[in-house]
A protein has these predicted regions:
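Glycine-/proline-rich flexible loop or hinge segments
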Residues: 5-10, 29-34, 43-47, 66-79
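Metal-dependent active-site segment of extracytoplasmic phospho-/sulfohydrolases and closely related
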Residues: 6-7, 23, 218-260, 264, ...
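Structural motif
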Residues: 7-9, 191-195, 239
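Short, structured active-site-proximal loop/turn typified by the sulfatase FGly-forming signature C/S-X-P-X-R
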Residues: 15-59, 108
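Active-site environment of divalent metal-dependent phosphoester hydrolases
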Residues: 16, 200-202, 247-252
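Short secondary-structure boundary/capping segments
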Residues: 22-23, 123-127, 207-211, 253-261
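His/Asp/Glu-rich, glycine-adjacent segments
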Residues: 55-207, 283-285, 292-347
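Active-site-proximal segments of metal-dependent phosphoesterases and phosphodiesterases across multiple
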Residues: 206-221
Length: 347
């Protein structure tokens, strides 16, 4: 590939926020911009798998940020293995097609998910060290060997505490952008995938209306500056995409409480509080037949549309029905007081 391509994933960036990002808006003015339909569920792992493969969740198999591994009864989140994607990612497709034509294709994958074992030439990803005594030490993993250490020697230690947890914020995004700048300058991959998570923190902590979105977007735009400059110097095309946007919600959904009150979820008490017991939880049994699933869906749809009909007659009135989709986009599940009645009906 004579012209390198840089794909920057700026989760949370939407059309309405672009005016706060002059550099990124400049890309749109020079090129184009189009709406991107979100996947369901609109979560990181699912969205990234769709962007990498062009497939929907039922095709690539990444249906959430976490999986229940039935063999061990464990729920594991934020898995990094590229083998979890049950469809061919773009870098694998490009390498195969290039080889068929007698050419080569190189790719750098920087902080995108499903990085371990990916068929890429350069990768950097968050990967803590876990000790035999249960200790955890923050760190990053890179391929080829020595890449992560080389980048940290030039850029400083990756600020892992700002990538996950209560201190999550701008420093990690700035570091990743500078990391991508170094990789693009030094190796000039045909495809560089860069994940910049800055807009995924405050809107989830405080809500959109509780966050200074203008400031956050300007910070993201500033963090992109060295990468965009290097892309221009390298003659690379830049595309910017987003996983999903954020909206305010006014109600809370507590499915685990409803499942527990219905006797479908069990927990094990211990010194660190209660821990989910998947083996004792009928919600994880996975023994449903197509006939029973159809019966559950029929009951759900009957109650749902009945509730929606009632709502349509009282558009400005109180919420009616135990399950409904609000015109404002919120999702309402059965209340705690109604959960038992719901389960009795589908039984």
């Amino acid at each position: 590939m004579s012209e390198p391509f840089v794909l920057v994933l700026t989760v949370g960036l939407t059309h309405k926020l672009l005016p706060f990002a002059p550099r990124l808006q400049g890309l749109a003015r020079l090129g184009w911009k189009r709406p991107l339909r979100e996947v369901l569920p609109a979560v990181t792992c699912t969205a990234q798998a769709t962007l990498l493969t062009g497939k929907t969740p039922h095709q690539h198999g990444v249906v959430a940020n976490g999986w229940l591994f039935r063999e061990t009864g464990e729920v594991r989140f934020w898995q990094q293995s590229n083998r979890l994607i049950q469809a061919e990612p773009i870098y694998q497709t490009a390498k195969r097609m290039a080889a068929e034509r007698g050419g080569a294709f190189t790719c750098a994958k920087l902080f995108w998910w499903f990085n371990q074992g990916a068929a890429v030439d350069w990768s950097v990803t968050p990967k803590p060290h876990y000790g035999a005594d249960g200790n955890k030490v923050f760190g990053i993993h890179g391929s080829p060997e020595g890449l992560a250490g080389s980048l940290e020697s030039r850029l400083g230690t990756f600020p892992f505490h700002t990538f996950w947890g209560p201190s999550a914020g701008l420093p990690c995004t700035s570091w990743i952008a500078r990391c991508a700048t170094e990789v693009l300058r030094e190796h000039r991959p045909d495809l560089t995938l860069v994940y910049l998570p800055h807009l995924d923190y405050d809107p989830q902590r405080f809500g959109v209306s509780g966050s200074d979105m203008g400031r956050l977007v300007r910070e993201l735009d500033d963090a992109c500056a060295p990468l965009l400059d290097q892309a221009a110097q390298s003659g690379a095309r830049v595309w910017v995409v987003s996983e999903y946007g954020h909206v305010d919600v006014k109600r809370v959904c507590l499915p685990n409480r409803a499942l527990r009150r219905a006797g479908l979820l069990a927990a094990r008490p211990g010194p660190f509080g209660e821990v989910l017991d998947t083996f004792a939880s009928r919600a994880f049994a996975g023994t449903h037949t197509p006939a029973s699933i159809r019966r559950y869906l029929r009951t759900f749809l009957e109650r749902f549309f009945a509730a929606q009909f009632k709502r349509s007659t009282l558009p400005d009135g109180p919420k009616v029905g135990s399950v409904s989709l609000s015109p404002r986009g919120d999702f309402r599940m059965p209340s705690d007081s109604q959960a038992i009645a719901w389960m009795e009906q589908i039984d």
